[in-house]
Swiss-Prot record:
Gene responsible for this protein: PTTG3
Motif (D-box): 61-64
Domain notes: The N-terminal destruction box (D-box) acts as a recognition signal for degradation via the ubiquitin-proteasome pathway.
Family assignment from sequence similarity: Belongs to the securin family.
Organism: Pongo pygmaeus
Any single Gene Ontology cellular-component annotation: cytoplasm
Molecular function in Gene Ontology: SH3 domain binding
Name used for this protein in its record: Putative pituitary tumor-transforming gene 3 protein
Subcellular location field: Cytoplasm; Nucleus
Alphabetically ordered keywords of this record: Cytoplasm, Nucleus, Proto-oncogene, SH3-binding
Pfam families hit by this protein: Securin
Residue numbers covered by motif SH3-binding: 163-173
Entry's Gene Ontology BP terms: chromosome organization; homologous chromosome segregation
Region named Disordered: 67-92
Length: 202
């Protein structure tokens, strides 16, 4: 048997609750409350109840019957225990804030300034732009193959040659003159085959 004594916060009158440990779990047994000399017996009810005093507020409408029954039981059993919960939560919150304050590292002392360890200037990176005296935007470079030069003297020779021109690809013979007769086009497509060997038996 466990006897728990609580003080009613609104009326400041002591009220006692006498219940077994098993009776506090899930509303398995009846709990007897003695407040102001009146004794009330509350038992867990199953199914629909039509009493106005025990009706749930409008916020908890009955959507699923089993869920609402479980919430009714938890509200009935945990009702007198709600007065102790804020004290525990306040203690836990103060412990958490103390831990958070102690875990916050010092901003300047613990860590060096990482930004100054790797200094860089975005303008100091390699620029792949050509200098102004070697601008090639005005040159027609469509079709020019990529040329890789090994030495700088070959680069000077390239600038002495003048602007490069696109290469002229030779057109295939069947596309060179569309006005040719089909027989002349077929003659260009003829391929000489090796002579037939009559000695081999098939």
């Amino acid at each position: 048997m466990a006897t728990l004594i609580y003080v009613d916060k609104e009326n400041e009158e002591p009220g006692t609750l006498v219940a077994t440990k098993d009776g506090l779990k899930l509303g398995s047994g009846p709990s007897i409350k003695a407040l102001d000399g009146r004794s009330q017996v509350s038992t867990s009810r199953f199914g629909k109840t039509f009493d106005a005093a025990t009706a749930l507020p409008k916020a908890t409408r009955k959507a699923l019957g089993t869920v609402n029954r479980a919430t009714e039981k938890s509200v009935k059993t945990n009702g007198p225990l709600k007065q102790k919960q804020p004290s525990f939560s306040a203690k836990k919150m103060t412990e958490k804030t103390v831990k958070a304050k102690s875990s916050v590292p010092a901003s300047d002392d613990a860590y060096p300034e990482i930004e100054k360890l790797f200094p860089f200037n975005p303008l100091g990176f390699e620029s792949f732009n050509l200098p102004e005296e070697h601008q090639i935007a005005h040159l027609p470079l469509s079709g020019v193959p990529l040329m890789i030069l090994d030495e700088e003297r070959e680069l000077e020779k390239l600038f002495q040659l003048g602007p490069p021109l696109p290469l002229k690809m030779p057109s295939p013979p069947w596309e060179s003159n569309l006005l040719q007769s089909p027989s002349s086009i077929l003659l260009t497509l003829d391929v000489e085959l090796p002579p037939v060997c009559s000695d081999i038996d098939i």
